[in-house]
Amino acid sequence: MPKSVKKINLRKGKRRLPKGVIHIQASFNNTIVTVTDIRGQVVSWSSAGACGFKGTKKSTPFAAQTAAENAIRILIDQGMKQAEVMISGPGPGRDTALRAIRRSGIILSFVRDVTPMPHNGCRPPRKRRV
């Protein structure tokens, strides 16, 4: 199960943030949640791997939910009330991470999907035969 939450030291000490941007990057192997201020400087981050999940458990929706809760816990202490959410990637944890953010009580001004879509670029990986 996940490790106990370790405190990520803030670069500029305890600062008040009324508004910020939450970036969710959901790949097939891991989910990374990064919280920045409006200028783009990272305030806190968390990932399924940093929460103590290993191997295939990192790619589960529950691991993404835990990562989102850990990243947001620091924000609520700093007084963040409003945030924008940018979701990127096709992974299984994208919806669960968003649901965890909604439950935290932060008002979401908008949710934007910024997944890069190719206009017929690189060839995708082959389908797995199990």
UniProtKB/Swiss-Prot annotation:
- Gene3D superfamilies with a match to the protein in the record: Ribosomal protein S11 (3.30.420.80)
> To which species is this protein native?
Marchantia polymorpha
Q: How does it assemble?
A: Part of the 30S ribosomal subunit.
Which protein is depicted? Small ribosomal subunit protein uS11c
A GO BP entry is: translation
Sorted UniProt keywords: Chloroplast, Plastid, Ribonucleoprotein, Ribosomal protein, RNA-binding, rRNA-binding
Q: Name one GO cellular component term.
A: ribosome
Q: Which GO terms describe its molecular function?
A: rRNA binding; structural constituent of ribosome
Similarity-based family: Belongs to the universal ribosomal protein uS11 family.
Q: Which domain of life is it from?
A: Eukaryota
